[in-house]
Amino acid sequence: MNPIVAATSVVSAGLAVGLAAIGPGMGQGTAAGYAVEGIARQPEAEGKIRGALLLSFAFMESLTIYGLVVALALLFANPFAG
């Protein structure tokens, strides 16, 4: 494998995971903050809020997992290795 392709693949894999984690991380923090605020306002709605929060966390975390899959594909099944 060309050393430039190998080095670029490693850097790209790192960027894929790093950038894929920024958005969901910020979104999870915001969602958790609003969930705590909502539970503080209406304690009787805690179950519904928590259920919606966990479901939204799952959807947000899937974006990070997609970034990890792209990084693993670049590292171990590199389509550019030729």
UniProtKB/Swiss-Prot annotation:
The outcome of changing T8A is: In strain: CC-503
Tell me the organism. Answer: Chlamydomonas reinhardtii
Q: Which Gene3D superfamilies match?
A: F1F0 ATP synthase subunit C (1.20.20.10)
Lineage of producing organism:
Eukaryota, Viridiplantae, Chlorophyta, core chlorophytes, Chlorophyceae
Query: What function does this protein fulfil?
Result: F(1)F(0) ATP synthase produces ATP from ADP in the presence of a proton or sodium gradient. F-type ATPases consist of two structural domains, F(1) containing the extramembraneous catalytic core and F(0) containing the membrane proton channel, linked together by a central stalk and a peripheral stalk. During catalysis, ATP synthesis in the catalytic domain of F(1) is coupled via a rotary mechanism of the central stalk subunits to proton translocation.
Membrane-traversing stretches: 3-23, 57-77
Q: How does it assemble?
A: F-type ATPases have 2 components, F(1) - the catalytic core - and F(0) - the membrane proton channel. F(1) has five subunits: alpha(3), beta(3), gamma(1), delta(1), epsilon(1). F(0) has four main subunits: a(1), b(1), b'(1) and c(10-14). The alpha and beta chains form an alternating ring which encloses part of the gamma chain. F(1) is attached to F(0) by a central stalk formed by the gamma and epsilon chains, while a peripheral stalk is formed by the delta, b and b' chains.
Entry superkingdom: Eukaryota
N-formylmethionine modifications at: M1
BP terms from Gene Ontology: proton motive force-driven ATP synthesis
Site annotation (Reversibly protonated during proton transport) points to E61
Q: Which family does it belong to?
A: Belongs to the ATPase C chain family.
* Swiss-Prot/TrEMBL keywords: ATP synthesis, CF(0), Chloroplast, Formylation, Hydrogen ion transport, Ion transport, Lipid-binding, Membrane, Plastid, Thylakoid, Transmembrane, Transmembrane helix, Transport
Single GO molecular function? lipid binding
The protein's predominant localisation is plastid
Q: What else is known?
A: In plastids the F-type ATPase is also known as CF(1)CF(0). Dicyclohexylcarbodiimide (DCDD) inhibits ATPase.
What is one term from the GO cellular component aspect held by the record?
chloroplast thylakoid membrane
Membrane topology is:
Multi-pass membrane protein
Q: Subcellular localization, per the record? A: Plastid, Chloroplast thylakoid membrane
Protein name stated in the entry: ATP synthase subunit c, chloroplastic
